[in-house]
Amino acid sequence: MLVIAWLLGRFSTLAISDVERPSRHGALDGLRGLCATAVFIHHSAMAFTLYSSGKWRPLAGLGGLEGNFMGNLGSMGVMLFFMITGFLFIDRMIVKKGIEDWGQFYRKRLLRIAPLYLFVVSVVALVCLAYGLPSGPLEFLKQYIPWLGFGFFRLPDIGGYSSSWTVVCGVLWTLAIEWKFYFVLPVIGVLCISRGGAGSAVAASVVATVALSYSGSIEGKSAVIVLCFAVGGLAAYVFETKWRDILNKWPCGIVASVGLFAAVSYSFTSYNYLSLTAVGFFFLCVASGNSFFGSLSFKPLKVLGLISYSIYLCHGLALLAASKMTDDGLYVYGLTAAALLVPGCLLTYLYIERPFISGMRSAQPPMSAQLKSQ
């Protein structure tokens, strides 16, 4: 994927200009690319098994460290995506002392998320209809409309395609989680600008979540997901303190890298507190500006970060297409899917995502001006 991104990036001046845009948190661009790649690799193994044996699960032959690693890559990527979201928006609360116009905020979020989402679910519907038509228009609408709900509703099968959710690798539930976070942001904003500040808000959310988890009010996975956003908030708080200058140094980078690899390789379950601790410390380092010896500044990885939303929503379609093109084993299958995915996602970014992003940016001062004012 990195090689393909590098080749395509050289021929797309628009993509390169976006990658090179000044950023307050440049290392996060590369991290997004890493997360998208991790989710893709994880689902490649799952989809390969699905299209070869009919079961959505990791390769049956994988076990031990290799099996754990492949099995946990996806959850690691998703946890980091949640942390990035928590960090960016709580950092905004800290820097700008809240959000002045919540109506405008939600409109921008909708314009950022909805266009590509609606395009992808429409393509999914067309693919599923190719396998068989529903009994009539009303039946089709009954099947299709829940897919427009950003993951809030159970996804019924469309047309003749059994387990239609596998066409998107079941990722839509995470969008519902993100929207729930957006809905509680006004409360978080009040806490962030209160006397206690962001640190108190993060501490209160952690204590409340852990207490609810141990009382059985929320399940372990849900608690870990909530804490991912809290880790993002903690990183935003740390970014404004002297700890930032410690976490962005190479010794912390080495400790974080080893801890992350150990947690992903030795953990038998996803979304657990061990993984949260390791992934959380890794993220604290990245958010503090640690590029991990420049790896997160690698331009192809930043290109993948630029198109990470497209990769996240579209990789299931690429995996389905690749299953029709090759049966030469997992690695050839994965490479085939990547060769389809990255160019396709660059196109969806340029022609679906970017126009709406550019429209939102036109209403804001240039980033260079924002950086000078901080």
Region spans (language model):
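Membrane-interface helix-loop-helix regions
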Residues: 56-76, 103, 114-179, 277-286
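Residues within membrane-spanning alpha-helices of integral membrane proteins
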Residues: 29, 33-36, 78, 85, ...
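Juxtamembrane transmembrane-helix termini
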Residues: 5-18, 77-111, 119-136, 318, ...
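Hydrophobic transmembrane alpha-helical segments in integral membrane proteins
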Residues: 1-2
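Alpha-helical transmembrane segments and their helix-entry boundary regions
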Residues: 101-105, 113, 174, 182, ...
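Hydrophobic alpha-helical transmembrane segments of integral membrane proteins
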Residues: 111-127, 205-217, 225
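Alpha-helical transmembrane segments in multi-pass integral membrane proteins
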Residues: 11-30, 37, 41-70, 91-99, ...
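Hydrophobic alpha-helical transmembrane segments of multipass integral membrane proteins
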Residues: 38, 74, 81-82, 89, ...
